[in-house]
C-alpha cells in the first residue's frame, strides 16, 4: 500500500471539514487527475523525492491503476485519498480474490485525518462489491501507527513477517522485473472471517502494487 501519513495522525482535526466522495476511475476527468497528481506529489514528496516521481505531469497513480477511489475534499482541494483495485493474489497455492487498498495519503498540512476515517467510507463499498477481504501492505515501521488507527478499532488485522512478490510497474533494463519485499500485511475482513484467510508467509500479487 503506497502510503504517506504523519505519525501523529490519529483523530480528525477540528480545523477542517472534509467531504468524502466515492469515485469510479472512469468518472474522473483530466482536471481531476491533474489535481490528484499535484496532491500526491505534495503528500509523498516529504517522504522522499523518489516516492513523488510517479506522479509527474497529471498521472494520478503509481503502479497498478485503481478502479475506485475515496477522495476527501475540503475548502483547499483534495485532503485525503485511498484507492481500490480488485485482483486475485496467491497465498500458499490458494488463489484469493481481494480488494487491494493503496495510494493512501493525507495532505501534509492536515494532522489527524487518519486512515480509519477514509475506511468508514470505503468499507460499505467493499461490502457492495462482495469481496471476501480488503488487502494492503505497508512498511513494518508503520506497525504501531496502523495498530492505533485500525487494529485497535477492529477494522483490520495486521500480519507481520510476510513476504510479497510483485512485478515492477514498468520494465527497466537495469532492474529485475520482480520485487520481493518483507512487509506488514493489512487485512480487512469483509465477506469472510480472518479464520478463512489462507495460511502462508509468501503472497504473490502477480502484478504491480496499487
Curated annotation (Swiss-Prot):
InterPro entries, per the entry: Acyl_CoA_acyltransferase, NodA, Nodulation_prot_NodA_CS
EC number: 2.3.1.-
Family annotation (NCBIfam families): nodulat_NodA, PRK00756.1
Pfam families, alphabetized: NodA
Protein task: N-acyltransferase required for nodulation. Acts in the production of a small, heat-stable compound (Nod) that stimulates mitosis in various plant protoplasts.
Family: Belongs to the NodA family.
Originating organism: Bradyrhizobium elkanii
Keywords: Acyltransferase, Cytoplasm, Nodulation, Transferase
GO MF terms held by the record: acyltransferase activity
Gene encoding the protein: nodA
Protein name, UniProt field: Nodulation protein A
GO cellular component: cytosol
Localization (cell): Cytoplasm
Residue stretches spanning the membrane: none
Domain of life: Bacteria
